[in-house]
Structures are given as structure tokens and as C-alpha cells.
């Protein structure tokens, strides 16, 4: 069975962009692939984190993984820092990665822009991501457009290692959704919906209450026209709302356009809010039914399964690089 790896950072509230762009896809994959899904807490540390919030967010994210429909009996669900091989392999990969390669990473340029100081961890983040993927000899990685460049680096580093030390790593392939992989901000639909945005109205969080969901969607930025159509260049706000409606209902976007043809933006927003509230209510009920003890048990078992695979890969890498193994 082909293997899939992906992860989400526990660095803030999980929103519908995370869900529609990645997490929902995870559920569809669990029956056909050997799936490793990770709460990547080490990645979160590349920017300052409140320790109490980080712990809370880690538990919350793991519970949401389960609440959206991931079955711990079918997938390996674990926390990145619980498997130390991630950090160790990241260092080994840094030693064969070139400074220029990391300097060209668009995400580093964006996140470090205008800041007086940034962490080395933010700069070397792509090597930790590469380690996450390569440790499990992953075949496919569900990634958004913003991570595509990092996956290309992962492939380059893996191929370089294989050429230099002998066949070791599987060269992973991206699994990118052609439609809906990038959900945009409700307040600025030219930017991606983000949990790091200072304006909480830019996103609908999975655990938002119905009144908050309704308010955020009704306030979503649109345009001065009145025609409902998909046009990302001229009507990014409406196009974003149509996309969200399509993904939550399973309707083709053309069907959604026809459904609301001749109607006002307010009608689209109102019905979209009702759809989102209805869909998220199921996730929220599942979330409330999961205890912290159950989450910790699942994470412990997942880490044990992940570590069993990771240590074998790390051992192989060390041997090929000439490191002496401890008995």
C-alpha cells in the first residue's frame, strides 16, 4: 500500500481553509493509503509561541483530526516532537542542503520580510519538512500551493542523498487539489485565509459558534457589482464564497452559480452561512465527545507506530553516511 504523510501546525485556531484545503482530503485518503498524519509542533516553534497555548492547541488539533473523521485504527496520528528522529534526520539533511536553496524559499522571504530578526529554525524549516516526509519513505504528500516549493526541495535533497550514498529515500510526489486547495480570506480575498492574520474576521474557525460564523460570512468582502459569477480576477470575494459553498455541498461550482443566478449577494451569504453552520455542527459535536484522555492515548499509540518506522529509516541513513551506530 502506498504511503501518505502530511501535517498541520498547532499554531492557532484551525479554520475552514485548513479543513477544505487539506484535512478533509485526509479523510478520503485513509481507506486507500497507509496514512501518517502529524501535529507538527516543532514547525510551530519557528516563530514565538506561548507554551500554554501551544500545548492546548496541540491537543485541540489532534482532537479535530479525529472529529473530522480520521480513524486511529486506519491512520497513524501522532505529534512530531514525540518521534525524535524527525529532528535528528533534519540535521543530517541540512548537512547536504545548500544555503542558496534555502535562501530561495519564497515562504521564508515572506515571513521574514520587515523583521529585524528571524530564527534559524524559520530558515531551515524546509529541511525539517523534508525529514518529516522522508523518514516514512512517503509516496504522496497532500500539499497546498504554498508548500509546493518546499516539496520540490524535499525531492531534490532526497535525490541528492540517493545519488551520493545509495538508494535510500522514496522520491515523494505532490498530491495537490486542482480546485479548492487555496481558500481565501473573507476580509481580503486576494490573500489566503490564514490563522496568523491579525484580523479574526478573515477566517471561519472550525470551532466558531453559529452566531460568529453567520456574522463573519455576512461581513465577507465582495464587490460593488451584483452579478454572481466565478471570476477570480474581477470578483475574488464572490468567487471565494462560491468555492466554499461548492466544497461544503459537493455541488459543482457552475451549479452553485446557476442556483444563485439573478439573486443578490446577501442571499448567497445567508445560505452559505447556513451550510457552513450545519456542516461544522457535526464536527463540533464529534469534538465535544472526545476526551483529552482519549486523545493522549491515540497520540501515544500513534507515536509508537511512527517511531517503529522512523528509527529504521534513520538507522539506514546513519549507516550510509558513515556514522557509528550505538548497540
UniProtKB/Swiss-Prot annotation:
Keywords: Aminoacyl-tRNA synthetase, ATP-binding, Cytoplasm, Ligase, Nucleotide-binding, Protein biosynthesis. It catalyses: tRNA(Trp) + L-tryptophan + ATP = L-tryptophyl-tRNA(Trp) + AMP + diphosphate + H(+). Gene3D superfamilies: HUPs, Tyrosyl-Transfer RNA Synthetase. Signal peptide: none annotated. SUPFAM superfamilies: Nucleotidylyl transferase. Its EC number is 6.1.1.2. InterPro entries: aa-tRNA-synth_I_CS (IPR001412), aa-tRNA-synth_Ic (IPR002305), Rossmann-like_a/b/a_fold (IPR014729), Trp-tRNA-ligase (IPR002306), Trp-tRNA-ligase_bac-type (IPR024109), Trp-tRNA_synthetase (IPR050203). It is an enzyme of class 6 (ligase). One of its GO terms (biological process) is tryptophanyl-tRNA aminoacylation. L-tryptophan binds at residue 132. One of its GO terms (molecular function) is tryptophan-tRNA ligase activity. A motif ('HIGH' region) lies at residues 10-18. The keyword Aminoacyl-tRNA synthetase applies. The keyword Protein biosynthesis applies. It comes from the Bacteria. It holds the Pfam family tRNA-synt_1b. Disulfide bonds: none annotated. It is found in: Cytoplasm. Belongs to the class-I aminoacyl-tRNA synthetase family. Catalyzes the attachment of tryptophan to tRNA(Trp). PANTHER family: TRYPTOPHAN--TRNA LIGASE, MITOCHONDRIAL. This is Tryptophan--tRNA ligase. It comes from Caldanaerobacter subterraneus subsp. tengcongensis (strain DSM 15242 / JCM 11007 / NBRC 100824 / MB4). The gene is trpS.
